[in-house]
């Protein structure tokens, strides 16, 4: 394997300082390129509530997979998988080293191991496709399959309505990926050496206090106005993944007079604490990972320096 075919993972719970540390690493090692592994940073306009790096840092450090979709769109794990593989290949091809940083643990897992199964069947979507889109006609259903997935349409007979419907359903459930493409992702393990680091709290109570302090800072920085502006875009459904994010969901309920201001703050902090516990549970079970405590971040920079020296 080519010596340069390796990359870094930097994982950790929310608010622990992953992004700022990643930017510091990028400053010290220009050879490194940053890729975000965060299911919310992909959305444009979700800035304050996601603690997104500022415009200057995003531009100067070429942070990948940030601000790539509109909040009215649904960005799935399959979208991420497809996008991140392209970014990794492009970075390695340019002779640089990818550093993937974030807290969306499912994304990291899928990237490492590929997909184990197709998206689960959804009876509501199946009925809607057949009744409303195809008007209960198998010819219309098959023509739709030919349009969205011509490869699968050549392998499935028009009279096999269940298989045709399943192939069409997969396209819609996956966020626009043909069945013939998804199959390629099955158990498709990442073909590069990965050095994995987990940034963990030295003191969880300190992290929880940091979360509270950060959210109050977000409120002072105009978070309410940010959510109000998003909500004023009438095409934005509160149930969309973008608007269902922690903080945005609670602020929307406050703006709709379903929460008091105090309830909004309390529920946001409570949900963030729950997310942190979930992320730390993932990390505890994560194989082949080097843990770095958040009060010893310089140790990570030293380790990366040694790895770069050994492998370049």
Swiss-Prot record:
Residues 38-41, 162-166 are annotated as: Interaction with substrate tRNA. Its EC number is 2.5.1.75. It comes from the Bacteria. It is an enzyme of class 2 (transferase). Keywords: ATP-binding, Magnesium, Nucleotide-binding, Transferase, tRNA processing. GO terms for molecular function: ATP binding; tRNA dimethylallyltransferase activity. Pfam families: IPPT (PF01715). ATP binds at residues 12-19. It catalyses: adenosine(37) in tRNA + dimethylallyl diphosphate = N(6)-dimethylallyladenosine(37) in tRNA + diphosphate. The record marks 104, 126 as: Interaction with substrate tRNA. InterPro entries: Dimethylallyltransferase, IPT, P-loop_NTPase. One of its GO terms (biological process) is tRNA modification. Substrate binds at residues 14-19. Its cofactor is Mg(2+). Monomer. Catalyzes the transfer of a dimethylallyl group onto the adenine at position 37 in tRNAs that read codons beginning with uridine, leading to the formation of N6-(dimethylallyl)adenosine (i(6)A). Belongs to the IPP transferase family. This is tRNA dimethylallyltransferase. The gene is miaA.
């Amino acid at each position: 394997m080519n010596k340069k075919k390796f990359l870094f993972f930097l994982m950790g719970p929310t608010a622990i300082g992953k992004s700022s540390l990643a930017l510091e690493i990028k400053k010290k090692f220009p050879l490194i390129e940053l890729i975000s592994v965060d299911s919310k940073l992909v959305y444009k306009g979700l800035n304050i509530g996601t603690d997104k790096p500022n415009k200057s840092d995003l531009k100067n450090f070429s942070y990948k997979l940030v601000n790539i979709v509109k909040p009215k769109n649904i960005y799935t794990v399959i979208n991420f998988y497809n996008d991140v593989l392209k970014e990794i290949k492009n970075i390695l091809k340019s002779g640089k080293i990818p550093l993937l940083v974030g807290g969306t643990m499912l994304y990291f897992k899928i990237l490492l191991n590929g997909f184990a199964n197709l998206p689960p069947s959804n009876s509501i979507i199946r009925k809607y496709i057949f009744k409303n889109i195809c008007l209960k006609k198998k010819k219309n259903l098959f023509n739709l399959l030919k349009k969205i997935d011509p490869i699968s349409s050549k392998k499935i007979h028009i009279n096999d309505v269940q298989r045709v419907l399943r192939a069409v359903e997969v396209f819609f459930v996956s966020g626009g990926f043909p069945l013939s493409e998804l199959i390629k992702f099955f158990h498709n393990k990442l073909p590069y050496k990965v050095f994995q680091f987990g940034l963990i709290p030295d003191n969880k109570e300190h992290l929880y206090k940091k979360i509270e302090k950060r959210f109050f800072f977000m409120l002072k920085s105009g978070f309410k106005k940010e959510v109000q502006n998003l909500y004023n875009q009438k095409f934005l459904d509160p149930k969309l993944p973008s608007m269902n994010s922690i903080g945005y969901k609670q602020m929307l309920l406050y703006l709709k007079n379903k929460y008091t201001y105090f309830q909004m703050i309390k529920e946001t902090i409570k949900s963030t604490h729950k997310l942190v516990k979930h992320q730390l549970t993932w990390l505890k079970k994560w194989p082949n990972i080097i843990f770095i405590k958040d009060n010893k971040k310089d140790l990570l920079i030293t380790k990366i320096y040694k790895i770069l020296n050994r492998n370049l």
